């Protein structure tokens, strides 16, 4: 019996649904604890006061920016999974965002649920794995481009803010080296695959090479949906910028970009929603770049709340709709799975 089929007791065994539900419950508890700490711990009273005095208009703008960020992810998802029907693909994209927020598996949770939902939609598991890698690489490279531009602009004094090379040119240089190594990987992977001939490692090397080449092709091919990759990141940064505007204190834009992107690395830790972890990482990075700790702490909490709950709400609704469709049309799903398996067998 598969995980998505009904059990003998009539209860659907849906580990994905259970993971999402448990993640949301955990996030709710952690969120309540953080809010309680802000108002109960004397040293955090200043943060709580900043939060309560934020300008509603700018918070509304932050909500709009987060919705636009989600739309950006939908667009780049549909560009990468170009054979996926638009409505179905949009729901899978939103579900991935929700799982990435709620399930304590870092980014692996969102990719896993995306593969589970896509399997049988005329896509083999191998195709899904390669396309998922392309999606990850496209969004990662957009992050890299943005960080390099901000770091160089800040380091050479084009944009206002600290010019310490360790905080500006060093991060940009490390990212440039990493991107160069990534772009050189296809040739090395193909040589490795040729030396190995056949086997799992050779197949993995060939798949890696194809994913990187496909990523490069997507980034260089004119397609209006590519703006989604930029919008996904830039509107998310705009959420934080709007939250700063709501406090009346706004660090230089390049500082926001760099501190946001480096601080976001804490999101890889397997903590549901990175609650507490991400806020601490943001505060540390912004203070390192010279920002004031109290407004940064307030902005970090509000930013995280906005991004989490819009993503979770929209993504959970999309997941429920997908689940209903799966159970309503099991024969259609079986036909798609047979088609995908036959295509995979013929490759």
Q: Language model features by range: what are they?
A:
Residues 49-53, 116-120, 130, 210-217, ...:
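Short amphipathic alpha-helical coupling elements at transmembrane boundaries
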Residues 272-274, 280-304:
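Hydrophobic alpha-helical transmembrane segments in multi-pass integral membrane proteins
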Residues 1-96, 143, 153, 157-268, ...:
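Predominantly cytoplasmic-facing regulatory/coupling regions of multi-pass membrane proteins
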Residues 69-77, 104-115, 254, 267-283, ...:
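Transmembrane helix boundary and interhelical junction motifs in multipass membrane proteins
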Residues 82, 101, 120, 245-246, ...:
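Transmembrane helix-loop junction
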Residues 91-119:
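Hydrophobic, aromatic-rich membrane-embedded alpha-helical segments
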Residues 91, 109-111, 120-137, 290-302:
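Membrane-interface alpha-helices at helix entry/exit sites of multi-pass transporters
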Residues 99-103, 127-148, 298-313:
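Membrane-embedded alpha-helical segments of transport systems
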């Amino acid at each position: 019996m598969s995980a998505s089929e009904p059990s003998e007791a009539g209860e659907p065994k849906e580990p994905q649904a259970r993971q999402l539900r448990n993640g949301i419950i955990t996030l709710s508890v952690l969120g309540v604890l953080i809010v309680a700490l802000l108002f109960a711990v004397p040293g955090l009273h200043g943060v709580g006061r900043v939060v309560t005095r934020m300008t509603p208009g700018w918070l509304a703008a932050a909500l709009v920016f987060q919705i636009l960020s989600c739309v950006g992810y939908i667009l780049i998802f549909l560009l990468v999974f170009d054979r996926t029907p638009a409505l179905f693909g949009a729901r899978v994209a939103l579900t991935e965002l929700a799982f990435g927020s709620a399930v304590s598996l870092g980014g692996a949770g969102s990719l896993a649920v995306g593969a589970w939902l896509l399997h049988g939609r005329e896509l083999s598991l191998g195709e899904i794995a390669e396309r998922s890698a392309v999606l990850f690489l496209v969004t990662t490279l957009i992050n890299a481009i943005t960080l390099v531009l901000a770091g160089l602009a800040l380091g050479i004094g084009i944009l206002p803010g600290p010019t310490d090379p360790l905080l500006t040119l060093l991060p940009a240089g490390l990212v440039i080296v990493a991107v160069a190594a990534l772009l050189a990987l296809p040739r090395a992977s193909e040589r490795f695959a040729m030396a190995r001939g056949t086997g799992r490692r050779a197949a993995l090397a060939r798949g890696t090479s194809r994913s990187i080449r496909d990523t490069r092709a997507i980034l260089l091919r004119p397609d209006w949906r590519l703006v989604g990759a930029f919008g996904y990141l830039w509107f998310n940064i705009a959420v934080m910028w709007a939250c700063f505007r709501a406090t009346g204190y706004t660090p230089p834009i390049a500082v926001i970009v760099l501190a946001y992107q480096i601080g976001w690395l804490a999101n890889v830790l397997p903590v549901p929603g990175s609650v507490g972890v991400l806020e601490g990482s943001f505060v540390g990075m912004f203070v390192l770049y010279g920002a004031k700790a109290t407004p940064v702490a307030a902005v970090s909490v509000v930013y995280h709340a906005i991004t989490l709950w819009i993503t979770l709400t929209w993504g959970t609704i999309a997941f429920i709709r997908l689940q209903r469709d799966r159970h309503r049309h099991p024969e259609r799903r079986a036909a798609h799975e047979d088609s995908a398996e036959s295509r995979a067998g013929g490759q």
